[in-house]
Design a protein with these regions (language model features):
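Acidic, metal-coordinating catalytic segment for phosphate/diphosphate chemistry
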Residues: 1-34, 38-40
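Short loop segments at secondary-structure junctions
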Residues: 10, 39-42, 50, 113-118, ...
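A short, polar/proline- and glycine-enriched secondary-structure boundary/capping micro-motif
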Residues: 25-27, 55-61, 132
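A glycine-rich, hydrophobic loop/mini-helix early in the fold
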Residues: 32-64
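The catalytic Nudix box helix
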Residues: 45-46, 62-95
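Nudix hydrolase/Nudix homology domain
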Residues: 57, 96, 101-107, 111-179
């Protein structure tokens, strides 16, 4: 049984837990994390949702999922990335782009810079069926043509400007480190 911590509309902890199988009461929210892995070529890692998934089966997405009861957002992001791809990162490597409140959840959008070979990715059974690196242009085209899960694309577009500022600024810092 998967349990979530519950929050109010201002993200104040309600000191209650919720069983994922039950509908959320109005005014109650849980936390969902999205992790966008970006390599040194500025490509974005996407994974294919398993064909047996109830929603958005066979659609591409960024890694993500619900934060479990007792976890912080960063701990949930580290866990989800490891479970769905086998990629290990530390909480300190995660860069929070922002958070947005949805209908029943707060979505925390993280970026992590990591060079990973596709052959090293370990897909989670019944969750992910494939993985690939795509350029930003390909990612946006996937969103436009519906092969990228719609909520993933919508949330990415909300944070797109911050995403590119972060990537470009980090790249500039790395150039100066090499001088």
């Amino acid at each position: 049984m998967e349990l979530w911590d519950l929050f109010d509309e201002n993200r104040r902890f309600l000191y209650k837990q919720h069983n994922r199988q039950e509908p959320l009461a109005p005014g109650h929210y849980h936390v969902v994390v999205v992790v966008c892995v970006v390599n040194s070529k500025e490509e974005i890692l996407v994974t294919l949702r398993h064909p047996a998934k109830e929603t958005y089966a066979n659609c591409w997405e960024n890694t993500g999922g619900s934060v479990l009861a007792g976890e912080t957002s960063r701990q949930g992001a580290v866990r989800e990335l490891k479970e769905e791809t086998g990629i290990g990162v530390s909480e300190e490597e995660l860069m929070l782009l922002g958070s947005v409140r949805g209908i029943s959840a707060f979505y925390d959008f993280y970026v992590v810079r990591k060079d990973v070979e596709l052959s090293d990715i370990v897909l989670q059974e019944n969750e992910t069926a494939d993985a690939r690196w795509v350029t930003l242009e390909q990612f946006i085209q996937m969103g436009e043509d519906g092969t990228l899960a719609e909520p993933v694309y919508r949330r990415f577009r909300q944070f797109e400007e911050a995403f590119w500022k972060l990537i470009k600024n980090e790249g500039e810092e790395r150039k100066h480190e090499n001088l």
